[in-house]
């Protein structure tokens, strides 16, 4: 029995190591190549389309970093991760606050996630909230910070984050909401998109707002006022 248990544990450990080696190699390749999609994109496409993947899809259009408005970069940093350029992928104080909140609730309800942590989750992981997934998120976060500079991390984030139902990335979002390229977003438009990030489906379609109470207009105003102090990595 113990030998069988040891075999199972060994196989599981080998699988974890192999998976992380794949993540490590994939992220290293993104110094040169752009990721075609993310785990979250693929899951959403399956949710929206089911088996009809030939004629159904998501709106995702990759654009280079310099073709994304500086207004949007500042708005996202001001909203999601004010210390993005200075931390090493995670912020201990925010994670400790999230830990205390989770202990009070008895399960994972908050993650204290930086932009890099959000990117790690979206690229490779499921949307489930549990401590094992959070641990893997931290490992992938380290990999992203090891291989990629801050500008590249922000570029991939802005091109892969969800901004509505089936809408992914800055270019698709700019066209979807404002009928203009991401390079031409104004301060107000950028602030509105950044305000949508915690609940992008709700921002896009009211039917997703049943259990969400967010004043997107008020939040966008706050973000716009903070954009001037946001530090960009370029």
Swiss-Prot record:
Recorded topology in the membrane: Single-pass membrane protein
The GO annotation for biological process reads: cell wall organization; peptidoglycan biosynthetic process; regulation of cell shape
Cell inner membrane among keywords? yes
Q: Membrane-crossing residues?
A: 8-28
Q: Give the pathway annotation.
A: Cell wall biogenesis; peptidoglycan biosynthesis
* EC supergroup of this enzyme: transferase
Question: What are the record keywords, sorted?
Answer: Cell inner membrane, Cell membrane, Cell shape, Cell wall biogenesis/degradation, Glycosyltransferase, Membrane, Peptidoglycan synthesis, Transferase, Transmembrane, Transmembrane helix
Q: What reaction is this protein's catalytic activity?
A: [GlcNAc-(1->4)-Mur2Ac(oyl-L-Ala-gamma-D-Glu-L-Lys-D-Ala-D-Ala)](n)-di-trans,octa-cis-undecaprenyl diphosphate + beta-D-GlcNAc-(1->4)-Mur2Ac(oyl-L-Ala-gamma-D-Glu-L-Lys-D-Ala-D-Ala)-di-trans,octa-cis-undecaprenyl diphosphate = [GlcNAc-(1->4)-Mur2Ac(oyl-L-Ala-gamma-D-Glu-L-Lys-D-Ala-D-Ala)](n+1)-di-trans,octa-cis-undecaprenyl diphosphate + di-trans,octa-cis-undecaprenyl diphosphate + H(+)
PANTHER family linked to this entry? BIOSYNTHETIC PEPTIDOGLYCAN TRANSGLYCOSYLASE, MONOFUNCTIONAL BIOSYNTHETIC PEPTIDOGLYCAN TRANSGLYCOSYLASE
Q: What does this protein do?
A: Peptidoglycan polymerase that catalyzes glycan chain elongation from lipid-linked precursors.
Protein name as catalogued: Biosynthetic peptidoglycan transglycosylase
Q: Which lineage ranks, top first, belong to the organism behind this chain?
A: Bacteria, Pseudomonadati, Pseudomonadota, Betaproteobacteria, Burkholderiales
